[in-house]
């Protein structure tokens, strides 16, 4: 009887963990072209993983290239 209870509790725990997708810890990797000459002046803000709002994904890529950082997109929109 104890074995059956342990098995059922283990199965329930596994099912509850399997239903939740893992959280994205480091944010979404920005889609950066190989070379960035400049960014279009289109305002489509993104929130970087550093807590700074960038005017666009291109602007975030430009900053990453300029300073050698690897800031990701925490979410679309302002921080």
From Swiss-Prot:
Top-level taxon: Eukaryota
Site entry: Reactive bond for trypsin: 41-42
Subcellular location: Secreted
Entry-linked InterPro entries: Kazal_dom (IPR002350), Kazal_dom_sf (IPR036058)
Annotated Gene3D superfamilies: 3.30.60.30
Keyword vocabulary terms for this entry: Disulfide bond, Protease inhibitor, Secreted, Serine protease inhibitor, Signal
Main location per the UniProt record: secreted
SUPFAM superfamilies: Kazal-type serine protease inhibitors (SSF100895)
GO biological process, one term: cellular response to peptide hormone stimulus
Transmembrane segments: none
GO molecular function, one term: peptidase inhibitor activity
Signal peptide start and end residues: 1-18
SMART domains: KAZAL (SM00280)
UniProt GO cellular component terms: extracellular space
Site (Necessary for sperm binding): 43-44
Kazal-like domain mapped to chain residues: 26-79
Disulfide bonds: 32-61, 39-58, 47-79
UniProt function note: Serine protease inhibitor which exhibits anti-trypsin activity. In the pancreas, protects against trypsin-catalyzed premature activation of zymogens.
Protein name as annotated: Serine protease inhibitor Kazal-type 1
Native species: Rattus norvegicus
């Amino acid at each position: 009887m104890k074995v059956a209870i342990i098995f059922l509790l283990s199965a329930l725990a596994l099912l509850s963990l399997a239903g939740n997708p893992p959280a994205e810890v480091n944010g979404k990797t920005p889609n950066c072209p190989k070379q960035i000459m400049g960014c279009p002046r289109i305002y489509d803000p993104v929130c970087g993983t550093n807590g700074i709002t960038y005017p666009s994904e291109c602007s975030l890529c430009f900053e990453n290239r300029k300073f050698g950082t690897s800031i990701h997109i925490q979410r679309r929109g302002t921080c």
